[in-house]
Structure formats: C-alpha cells, structure tokens
C-alpha cells in the first residue's frame, strides 16, 4: 500500500513539473511579444523624430544587442518558432 502512495506521489510531481514547464514556456512567449512591441514603439518614436538623431538610442540598445541579433537572425526567422 505504501508503494502505491509513492507511485501516486511521483505521478503527481511529474504532472506538476510538466504543467509548470508549459506555463513557463507560454510566459516566455508573452514576454518576448511584449519586448517586440516595445521595440516597435521605439522605432515609431524614432521615425517621428527622424530629424534629431542622438546617441541615446545606442545606450538603450547596449543590453539588447545580442538579443536583437538572435531575434533577427535568419535561422531563427526560418524556424518560425521564435514567437
């Protein structure tokens, strides 16, 4: 009887891990979409202010350059699963 309880506990833990992994994947997709939306907004703002180029945008991209390169690389776009 005790072994049946351990099996049930193991199954419950396994199901919980799978559910949390799926939820985390969806969370990451949502965060990526929000980041893309934010970048699009920044691009629109820059288009409106195209006469005044500043170095502020370079500072804004410092932490995101690697992320943008990964996001916009052709291999990621071809896979179709980046968002």
From Swiss-Prot:
What processes in GO biological process is this protein linked to? receptor catabolic process; symbiont-mediated suppression of host innate immune response; symbiont-mediated suppression of host type I interferon-mediated signaling pathway; symbiont-mediated-mediated suppression of host tetherin activity; viral release from host cell
Q: How is its activity regulated?
A: Ion channel activity is inhibited by hexamethylene amiloride in vitro.
Superkingdom of origin:
Viruses
Posttranslational modification, per the record?
Answer: Phosphorylated by host CK2. This phosphorylation is necessary for interaction with human BTRC and degradation of CD4.
Q: Which Gene3D superfamilies match?
A: HIV-1 VPU cytoplasmic domain
- Indicate whether S-adenosyl-L-methionine appears among the record's keywords: no
Q: How does it sit in the membrane?
A: Single-pass type I membrane protein
Q: Name one GO cellular component term.
A: host cell membrane
In alphabetical order, the GO MF annotations are: CD4 receptor binding; monoatomic cation channel activity
Q: Where are the transmembrane segments?
A: 5-25
Topological domain spans for side Cytoplasmic: 26-83
Give yes or no: UniProt keyword Transmembrane helix.
yes
Q: Which residues carry this modification: Phosphoserine?
A: 50, 54
List the Extracellular topological domains. Answer: 1-4
Q: Which UniProt keywords apply?
A: AIDS, Apoptosis, Host membrane, Host-virus interaction, Inhibition of host innate immune response by virus, Inhibition of host tetherin by virus, Ion channel, Ion transport, Membrane, Phosphoprotein, Transmembrane, Transmembrane helix, Transport, Viral immunoevasion
Q: Where in the cell is it found?
A: Host membrane
Other comments? HIV-1 lineages are divided in three main groups, M (for Major), O (for Outlier), and N (for New, or Non-M, Non-O). The vast majority of strains found worldwide belong to the group M. Group O seems to be endemic to and largely confined to Cameroon and neighboring countries in West Central Africa, where these viruses represent a small minority of HIV-1 strains. The group N is represented by a limited number of isolates from Cameroonian persons. The group M is further subdivided in 9 clades or subtypes (A to D, F to H, J and K).
Q: Which family does it belong to?
A: Belongs to the HIV-1 VPU protein family.
What does this chain do?
A: Enhances virion budding by targeting host CD4 and Tetherin/BST2 to proteasome degradation. Degradation of CD4 prevents any unwanted premature interactions between viral Env and its host receptor CD4 in the endoplasmic reticulum. Degradation of antiretroviral protein Tetherin/BST2 is important for virion budding, as BST2 tethers new viral particles to the host cell membrane. Mechanistically, Vpu bridges either CD4 or BST2 to BTRC, a substrate recognition subunit of the Skp1/Cullin/F-box protein E3 ubiquitin ligase, induces their ubiquitination and subsequent proteasomal degradation.
Query: How does it associate, per the subunit comment?
Result: Homopentamer. Interacts with host CD4 and BRTC; these interactions induce proteasomal degradation of CD4. Interacts with host BST2; this interaction leads to the degradation of host BST2. Interacts with host FBXW11. Interacts with host AP1M1; this interaction plays a role in the mistrafficking and subsequent degradation of host BST2. Interacts with host RANBP2; this interaction allows Vpu to down-regulate host BLM sumoylation.
Any notes on this protein's domains?
Answer: The N-terminus and transmembrane domains are required for self-oligomerization and proper virion budding, whereas the cytoplasmic domain is required for CD4 degradation. The cytoplasmic domain is composed of 2 amphipathic alpha helix that form a U-shape.
What protein does this entry describe?
Answer: Protein Vpu
């Amino acid at each position: 009887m005790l072994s049946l309880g351990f099996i049930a506990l193991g199954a419950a833990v396994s199901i919980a891990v799978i559910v949390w992994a799926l939820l985390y994947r969806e969370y990451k997709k949502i965060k990526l979409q929000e980041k893309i939306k934010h970048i699009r907004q920044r691009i629109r703002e820059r288009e409106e202010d195209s006469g005044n180029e500043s170095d502020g945008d370079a500072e804004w991209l410092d932490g995101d350059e690697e992320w943008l390169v990964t996001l916009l690389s052709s291999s990621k776009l071809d896979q179709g699963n980046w968002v």
